[in-house]
């Protein structure tokens, strides 16, 4: 085996402990593999085993990164993948309010046992790639006791013709210390849009931007690609057309700017997987404004069509958590008075009824199309036995990595949670069948 010496960091990749005295350390790590940089991403996410990533950085840098995790700023790290060097990369923690901010009781305390991380391969080396990707997400899955949710649900969206990121698993080590099992999730960025929209790849990508305002600043803060000199004229027109129309005219406006059939398929999956922390959940802030999250919108530059992409699906496929969330009217219902706000999480948060939103108000004008999408889902990707087989197969793949994760869960607890998930799938199917039969709410 050849060795990689990283004098700039004072450390390298692998399992060996760092030397004393701060001298450069030679670690067992193969030279970079060009095939890894230029490989097909499909091969990465379809691997039949759990790959290992090693990150090496100075002890004081690692300590500072943990203490300042909420800053979400990259630091230099030397990365190895399956024992081969990936070179110098940017490494940071990542997350939203529920997965990062709430993990800090005080500025320098880190009570959560494991945090999600992100790698940027070209942060310090221009043009550096990993399976043609600039960035890669490692999600801690601390809200998913089975460690299966993201892989199963992203696949389910794609099975229904909805564009969604790819997901698998990986184990991480930092300075030789095991960090445990993570969901390895594709970044939604320019590489993603080139892959998914090859006929229209260079459009604007927005994170958590919804057609609710004509203020350009709102979209400025949420654009992810082609930011420089960006005009948001189409998004603003989209929002304006929805706001100025009612009833069937609002549905016609929605049809102008989106693929309504695709949105109906999106909602069929979203409802089936019990996604109570996605696009239908409009959290109300102290000022009375309400916003949803965990999605992207991609504006196709030629057609002007807006395509919805799901994101952050750990809070799905959980019957118990869904029941705990709270009683909120479904997106198919328009309350008698809007806005209508409801307490969730036992009064800890308030959300606005999604039926008060202009996009959902428009989409609910064609519930027959939505029901057809649900029927397609129930007879196809969500049919009895299919997801149960996926649960068994994926659980078999990650079983050993779960058992070795220093942050848990205990193997017997994990096996129990996997069994609960398999049992809950029939409850989810029954709920969707009941909704097709005319039930407006979850009783």
Please provide the spans of the model-predicted regions.
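Bacterial N-terminal signal peptides
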Residues: 1-8
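Phosphate/dinucleotide-binding and metal-coordinating scaffold of catalytic cores
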Residues: 14-16, 21-443
């Amino acid at each position: 085996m050849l060795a990689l010496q990283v004098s700039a960091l004072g450390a390298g990749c692998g399992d060996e402990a760092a030397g004393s005295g701060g001298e450069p350390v030679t670690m067992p790590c193969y030279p970079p593999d060009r095939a890894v940089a230029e490989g097909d991403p499909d091969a990465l996410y379809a691997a039949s085993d759990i790959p290992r990533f090693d990150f090496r950085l100075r002890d004081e840098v690692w300590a500072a990164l943990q203490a300042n995790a909420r800053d979400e700023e990259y630091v230099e790290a030397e990365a190895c993948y399956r024992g081969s060097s990936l070179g110098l990369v940017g490494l940071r923690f990542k997350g939203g309010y529920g997965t990062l901010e709430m993990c800090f009781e005080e500025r320098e305390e880190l009570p959560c046992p494991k945090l999600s991380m992100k790698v940027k391969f070209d942060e310090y080396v221009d043009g550096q790639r990993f399976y043609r990707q600039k960035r890669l997400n490692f999600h801690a899955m601390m809200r998913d006791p089975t460690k299966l949710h993201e892989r199963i649900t992203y696949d389910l969206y794609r099975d229904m013709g909805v564009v969604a990121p790819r997901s698998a698993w990986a184990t991480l080590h930092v300075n030789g210390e095991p960090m445990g099992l993570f969901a390895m999730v594709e970044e939604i960025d320019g590489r993603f849009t080139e892959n998914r929209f090859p006929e229209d790849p260079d459009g604007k990508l927005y994170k958590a931007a919804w057609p609710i305002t004509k203020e350009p600043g709102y979209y400025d803060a949420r654009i992810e690609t082609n930011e420089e000199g960006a005009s948001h004229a189409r998004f603003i027109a989209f929002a304006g057309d929805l706001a100025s129309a009612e009833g069937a005219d609002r549905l016609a406006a929605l049809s102008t700017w989106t693929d309504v059939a695709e949105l109906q398929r999106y909602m069929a999956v979203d409802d089936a997987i019990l996604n109570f922390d996605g696009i239908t959940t409009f959290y109300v802030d102290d000022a009375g404004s309400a916003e949803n999250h965990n999605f992207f919108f991609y504006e196709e530059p030629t057609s002007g069509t807006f395509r919805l992409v799901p994101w952050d699906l750990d809070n799905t496929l959980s019957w118990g958590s869904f029941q705990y969330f709270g009683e909120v009217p479904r997106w198919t219902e328009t309350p008698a008075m809007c806005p209508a706000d409801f307490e969730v999480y036992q009064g800890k948060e308030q959300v606005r009824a999604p039926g008060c939103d202009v996009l959902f108000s428009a989409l609910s004008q064609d519930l027959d199309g939505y029901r057809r999408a649900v029927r397609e889902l129930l007879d196809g990707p969500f049919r009895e036995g299919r997801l149960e087989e996926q649960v068994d197969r994926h659980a078999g793949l990650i079983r050993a990595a779960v058992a070795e994760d220093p942050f848990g869960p205990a193997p017997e607890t994990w096996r129990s949670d996997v069994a609960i998930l398999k049992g809950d799938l029939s409850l989810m199917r029954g709920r969707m069948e009941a909704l097709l039969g005319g039930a407006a709410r979850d009783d």
